[in-house]
Amino acid sequence: MTIFDNYEVWFVIGSQHLYGSETLRQVTQHAEHVVKALNTEAKLPCKLVLKPLGTSPDEITAICRDASYDDRCAGLVVWLHTFSPAKMWINGLSILNKPLLQFHTQFNAALPWDSIDMDFMNLNQTAHGGREFGFIGARMRQQHAVVTGHWQDKHAHARIGSWMRQAVSRQDTRHLKVCRFGDNMREVAVTDGDKVAAQIKFGFSVNTWAVGDLVQVVNAVSDGDINALVDEYESHYTLTPATQIHGDKRQNVLEAARIELGMKRFLEQGGFHAFTTTFEDLHGLKQLPGLAVQRLMQQGYGFAGEGDWKTAALLRIMKVMSGGLPGGTSFMEDYTYHFEKGNDLVLGSHMLEVCPSIAVEEKPILDVQHLGIGGKDAPARLIFNTQTGPAIVASLIDLGDRYRLLVNCIDTVKTPHDLPKLPVANALWKAQPDLTIASEAWILAGGAHHTVFSHALDLNDMRQFAEMHDIEITVIDNDTRLPAFKDALRWNEVYYGFKR
């Protein structure tokens, strides 16, 4: 069972009684056929549920009201099969609090050139019925998604599926609880922010729990549970000699397993799906959680280091959005550069916490090595290189009056040399359009040093996310030019200032 099994999307047909009962019967028949086909053939992440026709203001308002209060409903897909006067939709749309997608399609793909008559024209009016619906959305300043294409078109299927993922993610975010073990890293600016504003805008809550509360749960873990988890480690990873059963770091592995089990129990008991740690607040823990965090991220939890709750929440959101898709999604940090003319590279990593979902195919290495930061015992961690190919890094920042999402499109490349002395997982990439423009644009826009890295999602996914949550998005890709980028930042300042 996946998170998408907990939700459904309602399929709503807009029409009116003007055309008579026979036309409405055909509309219903077409709708039933389309919904059945989409559910069986389109590989959508969650189920479409056909609702009764919306042919009057009261019917439409009732559907929108019910959708708003049904926890299983992630959003509405609306098809204007015939002309549906848009004033009928005003009350319903004014109370709808779920995402809305307008599927601009029609039942037939080709025109029946020899037999087309006015009955056919009246029945198949998406071409102008959809425009009427679009006007009322624009008039009410209600942004919604639009997908145009025949209902049998695979590209349309993919776009609807992508939107569904966003809709489900939005609903999940409304219930998301972020646990901060300790506070932010001292004196760091970008990881701080307005948690009340975040809950108002996105829905997720952020609260702090003392590390001592976690330590109590960690210390209560039984040796039997620890040994069972270490057996799992041995089947999934390549253990270095020091971490094997008679190795001198074996106890560190056992302690890492204890921390993982305790941390997961704490998160489950509290209903948390994202969390942060900080190396400055580890009182009672014997090592900085590394292996535990990596494995919890792989299970779908959001995480960020140094108390960075915005990135932790964004990682959870993107994990939900990408559920079931090929490729992984991880916490990441731009760590250091390789300057070489024509081949500038970014080496991304963190102290320990990179998600194995982005790893290359072979087994990760489980090792224990010294970590100078934090002042604790040497922590266990998984070491691996990352899959190659197109990816994105995304950052969510708090500008005081609004949130800005930054997205840089990147190309992950194979590490050209072994890294025998680097004891952490890492990713190597080329930033688009190049390192100079990408880094300068990122800095000018205020992007954080922490990001969410993803092979599974792309720029279109993040644009949809920004639109669905009504936040600013700043894009750095192969089309980026710094003068235009700076102008866009200035224009956005005016636009969002006006919106206040």
Curated annotation (Swiss-Prot):
PANTHER family: L-ARABINOSE ISOMERASE. This is L-arabinose isomerase. The gene is araA. Pathway: Carbohydrate degradation; L-arabinose degradation via L-ribulose; D-xylulose 5-phosphate from L-arabinose (bacterial route): step 1/3. Coiled coil: none annotated. One of its GO terms (biological process) is L-arabinose catabolic process to xylulose 5-phosphate. Its cofactor is Mn(2+). It comes from Citrobacter koseri (strain ATCC BAA-895 / CDC 4225-83 / SGSC4696). The keyword Manganese applies. Mn(2+) binds at E306, E333, H350, H450.
